[in-house]
From Swiss-Prot:
<dbReference type="InterPro" id="IPR014729">
    <property type="entry name" value="Rossmann-like_a/b/a_fold"/>
</dbReference>
<dbReference type="GO" id="GO:0006423">
    <property type="term" value="P:cysteinyl-tRNA aminoacylation"/>
</dbReference>
<keyword id="KW-0862">Zinc</keyword>
<feature type="binding site">
    <location>
        <position position="27"/>
    </location>
    <ligand>
        <name>Zn(2+)</name>
    </ligand>
</feature>
<keyword id="KW-0963">Cytoplasm</keyword>
<dbReference type="GO" id="GO:0005524">
    <property type="term" value="F:ATP binding"/>
</dbReference>
<dbReference type="InterPro" id="IPR015803">
    <property type="entry name" value="Cys-tRNA-ligase"/>
</dbReference>
<dbReference type="Pfam" id="PF01406">
    <property type="entry name" value="tRNA-synt_1e"/>
</dbReference>
<keyword id="KW-0479">Metal-binding</keyword>
<dbReference type="GO" id="GO:0004817">
    <property type="term" value="F:cysteine-tRNA ligase activity"/>
</dbReference>
<feature type="binding site">
    <location>
        <position position="236"/>
    </location>
    <ligand>
        <name>Zn(2+)</name>
    </ligand>
</feature>
<keyword id="KW-0648">Protein biosynthesis</keyword>
<dbReference type="InterPro" id="IPR024909">
    <property type="entry name" value="Cys-tRNA/MSH_ligase"/>
</dbReference>
<feature type="binding site">
    <location>
        <position position="271"/>
    </location>
    <ligand>
        <name>ATP</name>
    </ligand>
</feature>
<dbReference type="InterPro" id="IPR009080">
    <property type="entry name" value="tRNAsynth_Ia_anticodon-bd"/>
</dbReference>
<dbReference type="GO" id="GO:0005829">
    <property type="term" value="C:cytosol"/>
</dbReference>
<protein>
    <recommendedName>
        <fullName>Cysteine--tRNA ligase</fullName>
        <ecNumber>6.1.1.16</ecNumber>
    </recommendedName>
</protein>
Length: 492
């Protein structure tokens, strides 16, 4: 049975679905920029949860939203002399590229906030009619003091809250509130900004109400699992609970799961510290998608993930060994050695077959038990390594000894081990990658890094510029600075 740590109860609990279909909602991105390593960590973790539920014979409906109206999007549109919709659509496309590259299954539904305005307004109206919301000059606010259970997810004491903790508020908003802890459900339209009609006049929804409305519209009033990063526990998820349970008089979610944050060399990842890395930058620098995925899986999803060059290099080496094992059939086929097919005249001793089948069944049980234990991916990877090791050893021997002969028992062992390795790596979303013979990177990756280096030099971040130059040199590329704005390159 699957056991998960529930942030709401602060305990590991046995997972018991409400109905035949497990209903999951995951908070999605605000689409104003490319995704960073924190997004990779979060969405890989929840992809494992979804895959494991399916592997465990559950039916799953998985919904993840896009916040496509927000101050950050409007600011980016102004910077780019673009529109809110153009910025959103561009970054939604880029989001899919990154997630597809990392092997993350697309959600069953990905609603956009702007497509749910009518439902959001209806939701707010219910809160207003029940006395949980009040109007101030075209804005609508939720009154947290009307909810005696407010703070149950985060253990926040309302009276001790800092006004700044409510997130995404302005000084103008704080001056309109009955209490500093209240939060916006609807924001009055500003001049020259996109807005929507509502019972309270033109405006746009607050951040928190979007998810409450979309959860109800897509999955119903009570769902099985709600997902997100630990940075969303307060205020976002606390406010979701307040809104939804006030409006519906029902529990919003039975299980709340939160992933830990990403640190870089022991420090919190942030743009201000200049240690901020996008998924795109990392992949363009030569890190393979499955290396990044493997790296994320080495640490329990609830713990902080410390991103260092050394840890990534270690993950790369470990993944290469598994990837070689997953290439068994490709490698042996080239030399006309048939392992993949069970030939009609192939005889395998029954006692040997029983022994191998038992060994493999035990590994599958250990793998399942690891993931049953609050998604212990490190424990699951240990079993993957046990399966990959004999395959890797055989490949080394096969490549070293010409015309290597193996008997039918050995073929059976290799074939069944390989099939199991494929099955279990699929649960972890680890897919075979083309084996790279040398350390070369392609031209698009080189140009992307050159542009990133030019940007670093423009910001006078010469340490980052030197780091990129050295990285390219390791990959066999020499940079030639023709001018402050022009850099050419040659392979060496």
């Amino acid at each position: 049975m699957i056991k998960l740590f529930n942030t709401l109860s602060k305990n590991i609990e046995v997972f018991k679905p409400i109905d035949e279909v497990v209903k999951i909602y995951c908070c999605g991105v605000t689409v104003y920029d490319l995704c960073h390593l924190g997004h990779a960590r979060s969405y890989i973790a929840w992809d494992i949860l979804r895959r494991f539920l399916i592997y465990s014979d559950y039916k799953v409906k998985y919904v993840q939203n896009f916040t496509d109206i927000d101050d950050k999007i409007l600011k980016r549109a102004k910077e780019e002399n673009s529109s809110m919709n153009e910025v959103s659509e561009k970054n939604i496309t880029e989001f899919h590229k990154d997630m597809d590259a990392l092997g993350i299954m697309r959600p069953d539904s990905m609603p956009k906030a702007t497509n749910h305005i009518c439902n959001i307004c209806s939701f707010i109206k219910v809160l207003e009619d029940k006395g949980f919301a009040y109007i101030r000059g075209g804005d609508v606010y939720y009154s947290v003091f009307k909810n005696k259970n407010y703070g149950k997810l985060s253990n926040q004491n309302i009276l001790e809250q800092n006004i700044n903790q409510q997130g995404r508020i302005t000084t103008d908003e704080s001056n309109k509130k009955e209490n500093p802890q209240d939060f916006a459900l609807w924001k009055k339209a500003k001049d020259n900004e996109p807005s929507f009609d509502s019972p309270w006049g033109k405006g746009r929804p607050g951040w928190h109400i979007e998810c409450s409305a979309m959860v109800k519209d897509e999955l119903g009033e009570t769902i099985d699992i709600h997902l997100g990063g630990s940075d969303l526990i307060f205020p976002h998820h606390e406010n979701e609970i307040a809104q939804s349970e006030s409006a519906n008089n029902k529990k919003l979610a039975n299980y709340w799961l939160h992933n830990g944050m990403v640190n870089v060399n022991g420090q919190k990842m942030s743009k201000s510290l200049k240690n901020f890395t996008t998924i795109r930058d990392l992949l363009d620098s030569g890190t393979s998608p499955m290396t990044l995925r493997y790296f994320v899986l080495t640490v329990n999803y609830r713990k902080p993930l410390d991103f260092t060059d050394e840890a990534l290099k270690s993950a790369s080496e470990a993944w290469k060994n598994i990837n070689v094992a997953l290439s068994l059939f490709d490698i042996t086929k080239k030399e006309n050695l048939s392992i993949e097919v069970n030939e009609t005249n192939e005889f395998v001793e029954e006692t040997y077959k029983d022994m191998i089948n038992y060994e493999i069944s035990q590994k599958k049980i250990k793998f399942t038990n690891a993931l049953n234990n609050d998604l212990n991916t490190a424990g699951a990877i240990a079993i993957i390594y046990e399966l990959a090791k004999p395959l890797k050893n055989f490949i080394n021997q096969f490549q070293r000894i010409k015309n290597l002969e193996i008997n039918t028992n050995e073929k059976f062992h290799l074939r069944e081990t390989f099939k199991t390795l494929e099955e279990l790596t699929d649960v972890l979303g680890l897919k075979k990658e083309e084996i790279i013979i040398d350390n070369r990177i392609n031209e698009d990756q080189i140009l992307s890094l050159i542009n990133k280096r030019l940007g670093a030099k423009k910001e006078k971040d010469y340490a980052e510029a030197d780091k990129i130059r050295n990285l390219l040199k390791e990959k066999g590329v020499e940079l030639i600075d023709q001018s402050p704005e022009l850099t050419t390159w040659v392979r060496i």
